[in-house]
Amino acid sequence: YKGQGSITYVSIRHGGANIGEGNEINGLTLGGVGSGTTVSNIEVVGNQDDGIEFFGGTVNVSNALVWNAGDDAIDTDQAWSGTLDNFIVVNPGDECFELDGPEGSASGTHTITNGTTYAGGAQGLVDLDDNSNLVFTNQYFFGVADGQDFDQVPTADGFLDASNFQVTLPAGGVLTDFFKDGSDAFTTEVAEGANTVGADASVLIGWTWAGLSGNLSGF
């Protein structure tokens, strides 16, 4: 469905009711939404499950913030083929990014660009499938801890065009311990605050709960 209308300047807080064993509601679920729908300036705070999840479709999302999601911050499924541009991820409970490959006969490539991620207590940085298809660029990670990593670079039918990753590692950290399977090739270690890629936080600080409460001061 091509979609119509818009969702803008919305803060979604403390959602994610449990509707079954291991089945909670995402903060924002975009299922088969088309590129004719405008989704921009979205904040998801303290959701029980994923922050934003895409199931197919071609919708584009810009200026988004996911803060303290109980599960993954950003989750893509079923050959979503849109773009996520200019976003911040803060302290998810599981993966910062869970980027799945197409299912069945579906195909498509999505783009994730211009993001800043504070990993905090996350279980992992990026989790990909063998068949994930995406362009992944201009990302900055900080607040990274031992045990968090970027793994499973697509090796089967998948496609990964990744570039311009920067990370601030913990003291004594080794890049290849965090960015594995060749992902260190497109990642550069930088001092905190010295990043030259990532999100433009200024468009989020003035209206989001995270910004108004002072929790984006380091961004």
Question: Model segments located where?
Answer:
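Extracellular beta-rich repeat passengers
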Residues: Y1-F219
